[in-house]
């Protein structure tokens, strides 16, 4: 079954992490194929496949020896978009698994420009989403992680519209009120 297959894959990739990292994820071709395939499973699989694939990815990117996998995955705009879609799935369990990947993306202090830009563009929607996300979960670790992610999102520049001589223009303001011109996305 697909559940057994995912358990075997998960076990193979998480049991000997240094070996897997050195022999599998250090090969860029292998890593890119893995990302492409795990994304297919997360996007188009059954509920169980989506959840297990997302859970596997979340567990792999937090393993220190898989740093190259983590950096490659979390700096991709397409990967961020997929994770954001999964966070809006009707299944609370899948939302939580996707959050475990999303928090790594948001916590990254060296986000790629495309990832940073999409987070800025969706700042207000994300803050609204997190107002109700995970309210049923009283686990202290989850609550702390959610609070940290909300703080990180709140610290992103805010895009506001204002009129100038040329008409409407997007302007980015930092949480402290500093203003800078925003690039169109």
Residue ranges, per PLM feature:
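Alpha-helical scaffold repeats of the Armadillo/HEAT/TPR superfamily
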Residues: 1, 18-45, 69-82, 111-138, ...
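Eukaryote-specific intrinsically disordered, low-complexity regulatory regions enriched
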Residues: 1-4, 8
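Hydrophobic residues within the alpha-helices of tandem HEAT/HEAT-like
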Residues: 8-17, 42, 53-67, 86-87, ...
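Active-site/pore-lining binding-face segments in mid-to-C-terminal subdomains
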Residues: 72-106
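Proline/serine/threonine/glycine-rich intrinsically disordered regulatory regions
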Residues: 98, 150, 161, 180-185
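Generic C-terminal helix-cap and adjacent flexible tail
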Residues: 155-167
């Amino acid at each position: 079954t697909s559940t057994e297959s995912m358990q075997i894959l998960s076990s193979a990739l998480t049991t000997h992490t240094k070996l897997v990292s050195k022999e599998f994820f250090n090969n860029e071709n292998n890593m890119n194929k893995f990302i492409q395939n795990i994304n297919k499973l997360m996007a188009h699989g059954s509920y169980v496949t989506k959840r297990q694939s997302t859970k596997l990815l979340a567990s792999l990117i937090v393993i220190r020896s898989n740093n190259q996998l983590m950096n490659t995955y979390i700096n991709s705009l397409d990967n961020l978009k997929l994770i954001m879609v999964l966070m809006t799935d009707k299944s609370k369990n899948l939302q939580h698994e996707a959050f475990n990947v999303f928090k790594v993306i948001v916590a990254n202090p060296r986000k790629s420009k495309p990832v940073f830009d999409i987070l800025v563009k969706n700042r207000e929607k994300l803050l609204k989403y997190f107002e109700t996300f995970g309210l049923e979960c009283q686990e202290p670790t989850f609550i702390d992680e959610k609070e940290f992610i909300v703080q990180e999102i709140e610290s992103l520049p805010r895009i506001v519209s204002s009129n100038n001589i040329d008409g409407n223009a997007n302007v980015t303001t930092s949480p402290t009120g500093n203003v800078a011109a925003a690039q169109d996305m």
